[in-house]
Each structure stands twice: as structure tokens, then as C-alpha cells.
A protein has these predicted regions:
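Short, small-residue-biased leader/transition segments that mark boundaries at the very start
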Residues: 1-9
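Glycine-rich, low-complexity intrinsically disordered segments
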Residues: 8-163
Length: 163
């Protein structure tokens, strides 16, 4: 696979534009012990545990890409009151979130062939950010060095869709 991808995140247009790498998260399933006199056996559980969806993205000079995620955090934490929460609700009306909860967003990852033809689409449902990397400024860096940020998201589930 070539690793060429596109990531559609309606609530984060700048992050989407500057996206450098993403992952298809790992999945695990719980297990229930079966106790027998001489052995310990297990049976599959009934809950999937999804790993985080991670995005590495370039940080532009005005920090817009980083601020998009930071503002999403502020909208559901509302450190300055309900106005920030209302701001995200207004954005939800302008963008296609795919959900009735304004602090959640759906996202679609499209894996492309070497000829830029879509091969696989992965749809993430009801996603929201849980962490964003630090911004580290260094006077020893050259003007050509571009900062890269990482954001981690959780979601309800993901599905593979036809390309």
C-alpha cells in the first residue's frame, strides 16, 4: 500500500488540509474466563475496544490548525461559560457533522492507490478529540523546519465502506 490518504474532517478544515499521517486504529475484544477444575479457559467477550484515531498535521504559521482542535476542546469544556458551547452549536448548523450532538463529528479516511484512485474508505462515527500535542518553539530551528502536531481522537466505532 502506498500510504496515500485523505482525511475528511468537516469541523477541522485546516487540519484536514495539513494532514500528514493518520492511522486505522487497532481493535481488541474482551474475554470472559471459564473456570474448570483443571484448566482456565476463556470465551470471547461482547465489547469491542477501539484504540485512538491519531492525526499528525502540519502547524501553519498562524497556528490555525492547532487552534481548530483547541477551540473544539474549549467548546465542550467551556472554561469561559456557555458562549463557547453555543459557538460550536452554531458551527454544527453550518457544517455537516453527521450527528445530532454538536461536540461530536464523523470523519472519513480514504486510502488511495499509487494512481490516486480510492481503494478503501473508513468511516468514524461520533468522534471527538481527547489530546493534542504541545507546541515547542526553538530558536535553534531553521526557518525551513515545519512544526508537526498530533491529535488523538476517540469515537464510537468505525466501518469499512466501498470506495
Amino acid at each position: 500500500m502506498t500510504g496515500v490518504q485523505t482525511c475528511a474532517l468537516p469541523i477541522l478544515p485546516t487540519v484536514q488540509f495539513f494532514c500528514q499521517s493518520v492511522n486505522i486504529p487497532g481493535v481488541s475484544i474482551g474475554q470472559a474466563p471459564l473456570t474448570f477444575p483443571s484448566i482456565m479457559a476463556y470465551t470471547p467477550g461482547n465489547q469491542l475496544a477501539y484504540n485512538n484515531f491519531n492525526i499528525d498535521f502540519l502547524i501553519d504559521e498562524t497556528l490555525t490548525s492547532w487552534q481548530e482542535i483547541y477551540n473544539w476542546f474549549r467548546s465542550f469544556a467551556s472554561p469561559d461559560g456557555t458562549n463557547e458551547r453555543n459557538t460550536l452549536s452554531n458551527l454544527a448548523g453550518q457544517k455537516k457533522f453527521g450527528t445530532k450532538k454538536p461536540y461530536l463529528s464523523d470523519a472519513t479516511l480514504t486510502i488511495m492507490s499509487a494512481l490516486n484512485n480510492p481503494l478503501v474508505r473508513v468511516q468514524f462515527t461520533n468522534m471527538f478529540p481527547v489530546s493534542i500535542s504541545d507546541l515547542q518553539f526553538d530558536t535553534k530551528s531553521s526557518a525551513d523546519d515545519i512544526m508537526v502536531g498530533t491529535a488523538n481522537f476517540v469515537y464510537e466505532q468505525f466501518k469499512f465502506l466501498p470506495a
